Every structure is written in C-alpha cells, then in structure tokens.
Amino acid sequence: MPRSRINGNFIDKTSSIVANILLRIIPTTSGEKEAFTYYRDGMSAQSEGNYAEALQNYYEAMRPEIDPYDRSYILYNIGLIHTSNGEHTKALEYYFRALERNPFLPQASNNMAVICHYRGEEAIRQGDSEIAEAWFDQAAEYWKQAIALTPGNYIEAQNWLKITGRFE
C-alpha cells in the first residue's frame, strides 16, 4: 500500500490528496509521476523517522527522475538522513551532489558547513589544531555560499564568521 494512503496525520492526508490531484491534472510523464510518488513517500517516511524506508523510496525516485533540480532535492534529503544517522562522509557526498545539480540550495551548503564545523570541533578535542583550522576554513566557505544565497538567514553562522575573522 502506498505510504500516501496510510498517513494518519490530517495535514499529510490533505497534502497527499492535493498531490494526487495535481499528478492527474498537470501534464507529466509516467516517469515523473513515478519519481514524485517515491519522493513523496520518502518524505513521509522521513518525517516519521523511518529512515530505511525513506532511503529506499528516495533511491527509487532517483531512477526515473531526470530533472536536475528535482534530483537535487532527492539527493539533499538522502544527505539529511545520513546526517541524522551520523554518517557524515556519506552526507557530505550527497549534499555535494545536490549542489552540483542545483547550486541555489543554501540548506545543503549550510549542512555541509555544520558537518565541517563539527569535524573541526572534534579535531580540537583530539588536540589537532591544524586539522581543526582546515575544517573550520571549509565550514566558513560553505557558510559564505549559503549566506550569499539567503543573506537574512544563518545569523549564527554569520556571527561565527565575524567572531573568527572569516567574514569578508
């Protein structure tokens, strides 16, 4: 049974109904419809914390999806799941792939910065200040990208950049 039919949440049900109506009336190919259905089911599973099911749906959505913009959001969501699972190397890979297809995805840049900053903090705890600085410099670059796209957002990152002398 498609996930859209088992959601218990009123908003999720309403969104699913609207999405199904749009799929019927907007001219789309069968591949686009299939990709969207898997993507929608992946988002639903992800919102419920069912990450394995969400990943399965996202990977299935990637098969028929050819639009780079749409693929970027699938890749971004896969990155989110890997981040949640503590798989930071995989997460960075998926965020990077998302940005390759859609460079106007500030949340991917922000998440990459957060991971790099975290790794910098880990390096400090391990006593390696040189490695920490390299991670912090990389975090700064990703945050600058995110801020350039959405100047009013990421205030904490802007403050960190200013405090550490990395804001230009």
Swiss-Prot record:
Q: Where are the TPR repeats?
A: 35-68, 72-105, 120-153
Gene3D superfamilies, alphabetized: Tetratricopeptide repeat domain
Q: Name one Pfam family in it.
A: TPR_1
Entry's SMART domains? TPR
Key words of the record: Chloroplast, Membrane, Photosynthesis, Plastid, Repeat, Thylakoid, TPR repeat
Record's GO cellular component terms = chloroplast thylakoid membrane
Biological process (GO) annotations held by this record are: photosynthesis
- Function according to Swiss-Prot or TrEMBL: Essential for the assembly of the photosystem I (PSI) complex. May act as a chaperone-like factor to guide the assembly of the PSI subunits.
Q: What name does the UniProt record give this protein?
A: Photosystem I assembly protein Ycf3
Q: Which species does this protein come from?
A: Nuphar advena (Common spatterdock)
